[in-house]
């Protein structure tokens, strides 16, 4: 029976479907190439970790609905552990997988690099391994490993040995003795205890550490052995072919310690930052990995107390990728987000902006120049009007009417004056005024009259300091009615008296053109007969004989 749309059975059926089906996943901010966990504090993990046999998400959603992995299952006990990613190394066989029955804690630093570049990390012993292909004897190889804070490798478990045999070590083109099989110096020595029917001896650890190690089986001795050698050094022989390597085929050899061979170094795991630098204990650093915004503390060779910075999503970009070396730096993967055309457009915009700025600046400078030019023209017109007011529009000879001559002639004007304040508007302090002389009015070159002559006009020709310079002049007055004698007397009186140090001509020139000498009143008209008196130079001077009228 199909429920009706308006009945409550349809609502119950819909709720049942929502309960049974998979809940909708929230929108997580995971980058491309990452797996989004359904719930928990860990939201994003690398995509290769999905279905790898080790639950990384807290809800184990990365191992849900995964195909079953067939392989050999080995039980483990105690603190013994194996590498959960064994068999997934370079060149390894994915089907050769060792399951772990011990619960592994989900750690935020489980994917971070704990060894420097070139070293292979093994989680079971928290150690790093590296093969050096340069041919050295046993003792030189041991010193090389010690300089790297390690030693020649020893093995504590069979799983550790399997991990070393499964690795594909770097193979340069020209390596020492590199063939289908290789021998590596390791940290064991075989001590001879007897030479009866056969060589008898025991294995010893050359460099003892804090952890327990297992001893190899009886070795294969070298074909050429010296009877004086009682100590032989161990060599681990492994094969280069992947088929033989993943079947754990290997052998132990006891060789002379002075033979040259490749060697295997082992060191404890350490904190390595994103720039492949070894970090000391207790220091903050950014571990190696895909998150450069992670900050951790180095403790026991592992990053702990990690704090991650959340970066804001880049604006205007739908698909992007994080920079693996710099925090909060993204690379846009949109078709036109990082194209050559976009770069060229940005460059063209920059060029156009520079040209526009240059044109605007040029226009401003041109406008300032035009304003100053108009102000100069207005000032010149004001000066012309000023000259027309004082000289009836006639141009003054010798006056500079150009812009450079402003202020040198009649009533100068400043360039900053726009003329609105009046023709004679000045700024403090005012410029010096220059007196103007009209060219059509001839100015006399004679000096002004003496000061004494201005005060006492009667003594214009008298200088008390020059009493001795004047000689008395006798003047005989004619009788009344003698016209000829009167005219002669008048002519004598009009002549200036000679002075010491000055000629008569100088005295004539020094007199003002508007001055005139008047003759005393006629004795015949006044009714009195004047007595003849001596002129200056005698014992008594006459001060009423001459009058000067200006």
UniProtKB/Swiss-Prot annotation:
Biological processes per GO annotation: animal organ morphogenesis; cell adhesion; cognition
Region Disordered: start-end pairs: 69-92, 500-550
Modification Phosphoserine occurs at: 381
Transmembrane domains' residue ranges: 350-368
GO molecular function, one term: carbohydrate binding
Location of the protein in the cell: Membrane
Keywords, alphabetical: Cell adhesion, Disulfide bond, Glycoprotein, Lectin, Membrane, Phosphoprotein, Receptor, Signal, Transmembrane, Transmembrane helix
CDD domains: CLECT_DGCR2_like, LDLa
Domain C-type lectin residue range list: 115-241
A GO cellular-component term linked to this record: membrane
PANTHER family, sorted: INTEGRAL MEMBRANE PROTEIN DGCR2/IDD, INTEGRAL MEMBRANE PROTEIN DGCR2_IDD
The protein's name: Integral membrane protein DGCR2/IDD
Gene: DGCR2
